[in-house]
Amino acid sequence: MSTDLQTLTNQFKFNNEIYGRTTQGIPPEQWLIQPCQESNHLLWVVAHAAVTRAVAVRLLGGKWSAPWQSLFTRGQQRVDNGRYPSVAEVQQAWNEISRRLLSALPTASPELMGQPVEKGKPSIDGTVGGTLGFLCLHESYHLGQMGFIRKWLGHGQGLG
């Protein structure tokens, strides 16, 4: 495995640990509380990060889908809380997607990582590897939001 791919794998693993610490101990009834009317609740942020993590799985040749995934794509407006999947479903999805991603990353070939991606798709350098790097950065951004929401809900820091 190349150094770049090993670093990316380690970053996704570390993000997975941060996710666990950030969401640990928050009761399901608090996952739908918004810090303000214009912001997303924890369930939306976590599900969005999971759906985006699944993009990485698909780039690496894997599969994952859920009937609710379109509720959490970029730019989607919040819907009535009753339309969202349960906290348990979202956590199960995160765990399943994470297993698939962390299994697929070490087997990614240099040829796959160097393949160009469609113009306009987010990528650090226009390649599949660059898109995976962008997705990891994107995920880290949302982990920060999760940490803020955690603290705002009164559960203290997830890290540190």
Where are these regions (language model features)?
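Short secondary-structure junctions
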Residues: G25-P27, S109
